[in-house]
Swiss-Prot record:
GO terms for biological process: mismatch repair. This is DNA mismatch repair protein MutL. Transmembrane segments: none annotated. NCBIfam families: mutl, PRK00095.1-1. Residues 363-397 are annotated as: Disordered. The gene is mutL. One of its GO terms (molecular function) is ATP hydrolysis activity. Gene3D superfamilies: 3.30.230.10, Histidine kinase-like ATPase, C-terminal domain, MutL, C-terminal domain, dimerisation subdomain, MutL, C-terminal domain, regulatory subdomain. Residues 364-387 have a biased composition (Low complexity).
Length: 627
């Protein structure tokens, strides 16, 4: 068979295989066209699940008579005109394929009138060459599209349609999703002459929860937590259900929108799931209705035939942004604060020469996927632009710190004078500065050690606490601060703000940099050991601890942080949220002990209480000999 150009109808039918999957696909494409036309009211009439009739009527701007024929042609659209438009799409439709594809597998009639025209015009395509016929008609300003006998000329496609009830349920779900995306549009849905759904438009500044409850149900509305989160050009708004009260019925409510376009994106779902995983069971799913707004240049919507998926240019930033936004709201539900442990305990004093002799501290290095940011000098940050209002969103959820992070990254590193070479310290003796060799792990968090024929047990959590304290305690120079990807903004009382201002110099030595305003404090940087911690819990507790202190010493603060990280609640968070050290392995124990021996050699000479316990084998040996 020679190569030849396909007839227009056949080419459109091939394209319809991607665009028109079922009647719900037709409804989606046509309703999105109505929204792009500026409609504020859309009436949808369905018969026999969409197989017999789909009628969409709107009060949008309409289509001019001269453009009706083009509207039914392939690759004809008013949404884009250049490659620049394609790279920054703000409309729902843009390919110009929907009407041509639908008309090739159905009997489609397009009737429209603009405000400038005295009469309406009707167009329909027929025949092998899809010739368009235009004739006068009676119609108000707006557009009506009628799709009759879907797949009438493609029997193979028609036989794959499900039952009338199933097909209409898919249409109903599409309308639910669209109604959640556009609260300002009235949408009416009828099936076989009976009104099924009526979603009234919500006036600007009105109660969006009314429509939310009508679509998602009162059970979701009762558990919904409002979100408003912002970072630079990224904005996250909407609701997420309290994971502690999620039911299988609520788990079906998972609606996400990117710039007003409904999406099923795995990256977004993963970020939300990760933020809720400590409160959800293995077989549970979070329930949410979220709206992500992003610069159109930073997202590609032209990656899926049905436009169900998008691709973000900075996917990691978007993932972490959504994760932090959802997590911050869930943390508001923690009603019982942790008791502050003010029990004094002698802190090990860091020895600079041992730090030099130890070389690199692998325990304190970040994960390979995160580059280490350069040291910087804290500088005042300019205010960021306010977020758009969102009904019933709590003020504490507003995060407007994008400019803070940008300024941190743009701050040049200070010039450092070359240091004179320091004399090398003599190598440490093999046994004098060692706990011994690790034999095995006992009870998941204790290491069984052997040294010079003696057996002892070492508590790995206690050893980790001492190591964290040594890492946080400043030596000759302050601890290196690492800027946060998304600064943490918290509401504080007057007493807490005063304590933070008094402790600012001590916190700076520990690598904790913050900026305060009237009622909030913004954490901009933390030391490296805290980068992987849950700062939404740790920082409020630290502020509460500082509010009870009168003297602010870096060593005491470092000691408190180390003790807090290994508290009972922090261990629960580590097991459930980060799955960190729920079961210690031999490799983890050996690495930990090596770092403790390098940074805290005094612990080897004089172990503190709770760290090391000798095991007396003589009674067991004697019992064996007696038998």
């Amino acid at each position: 068979m020679p190569i030849q150009v396909l007839p227009p109808q056949l080419a459109n039918q091939i394209a319809a295989g991607e665009v028109v999957e079922r009647p719900a696909s037709v409804v989606k494409e046509l309703v999105e066209n109505s929204l792009d036309a500026g409609a504020t009211r859309i009436d949808i009439d369905i018969e026999r699940g969409g197989a017999k009739l789909i009628r969409i009527r709107d009060n949008g701007c309409g289509i001019k008579k001269d453009e009706l024929a083009l509207a039914l042609a392939r690759h004809a659209t008013s949404k884009i005109a250049s490659l620049d438009d394609l790279e920054a799409i703000i409309s729902l439709g843009f390919r110009g394929e929907a009407l041509a594809s639908i008309s090739s597998v159905s009997r489609l009639t397009l009737t429209s009138r603009t405000a400038e025209q005295q009469e309406a015009w009707q167009a329909y395509a027929e025949g092998r060459d899809m010739d368009v016929t235009v004739k006068p008609a009676a119609h108000p300003v707006g557009t009506t599209l009628e799709v009759l006998d879907l797949f009438y000329n493609t029997p193979a496609r028609r036989k794959f349609l499900r039952t009338e009830k199933t097909e209409f349920s898919h249409i109903d779900e599409i309308i639910r999703r669209i109604a959640l995306a556009r609260f300002d549009v009235t949408i009416n849905l009828s099936h076989n002459g009976k009104i099924v759904r009526q979603y009234r438009a919500v006036p600007e500044g009105g109660q969006k929860e009314r429509r939310l409850g009508a679509i998602c149900g009162t059970a979701f509305l009762e558990q919904a937590l409002a979100i408003e989160w912002q970072h630079g050009d990224l904005t996250l708004r909407g609701w997420v259900a309290d994971p502690n009260h999620t039911t299988p019925a609520l788990a079906e409510i998972q609606y996400c929108y990117v710039n007003g376009r409904m999406m099923r994106d795995r990256l977004i779902n993963h970020a939300i799931r990760q933020a809720c995983e400590d409160k959800l069971g293995a077989d549970q799913q979070p329930a949410f209705v979220l709206y992500l707004e992003i610069d159109p240049h930073q997202v590609d919507v032209n990656v899926h035939p049905a436009k169900h998926e998008v691709r973000f240019h900075q996917s990691r930033l978007v993932h972490d942004f959504i994760y932090q936004g959802v997590l911050s709201v869930l943390q508001q539900q923690l009603e019982t604060p942790l008791p502050l442990d003010d029990e004094p305990q002698p802190a090990p004093r860091a020895i600079p020469e041992n730090r030099v002799a130890a070389g690199r501290n692998h325990f304190a290095e970040p994960a390979a996927r995160e580059p280490v940011a350069p040291r910087y000098s804290p500088a005042p940050a300019s205010g960021s632009r306010p977020a758009a209002p969102w009904p019933n969103a709590q003020p504490g959820y507003q995060k407007q710190q994008g400019e803070v992070y940008r300024q941190l990254l743009q701050t040049p590193a200070p010039m450092q004078k070359p240091k004179a070479p320091e004399p090398q310290e003599p190598a440490l003796a093999a046994n004098s500065q060692s706990f011994g060799r690790v034999l095995t792990i006992v009870h998941s968090d204790c290491a069984l050690l052997e040294r010079d024929g003696n057996i002892s047990l070492l508590s790995l959590p206690v050893a980790e606490r001492w190591l964290r304290q040594a890492q946080l305690t400043p030596g000759e120079a302050p601890v290196c601060a690492q800027p946060l990807l998304i600064p943490l903004r918290l509401k504080v009382s007057g007493e807490e703000k005063s304590a933070l201002e008094k402790a600012q110099s001590a916190l700076a030595e520990l690598g904790i940099d913050f900026q305060s305003d009237a009622q909030h404090v913004t954490i901009r940087a933390v030391p490296l050991p805290l980068r992987q911690q849950n700062l939404q819990i740790l920082i409020p507790e630290l502020i509460g601890y500082l509010a009870k202190q009168s003297v602010f010493e870096p060593g005491n603060i470092a000691q408190w942080i180390a003790r807090n990280l290994m508290s009972e609640h922090a261990q629960w968070i580590a097991r459930n949220l980060m799955s960190e050290h729920a079961q210690w392995s031999m490799a983890q124990a050996i690495t930990l002990l090596a770092d403790v021996e390098r940074l805290c050699p005094q612990l080897v000479k004089t172990p503190p209480g709770g760290l090391l316990q000798s095991v007396d084998l003589h009674p067991a040996i004697k019992a064996l000999k007696d038998e």
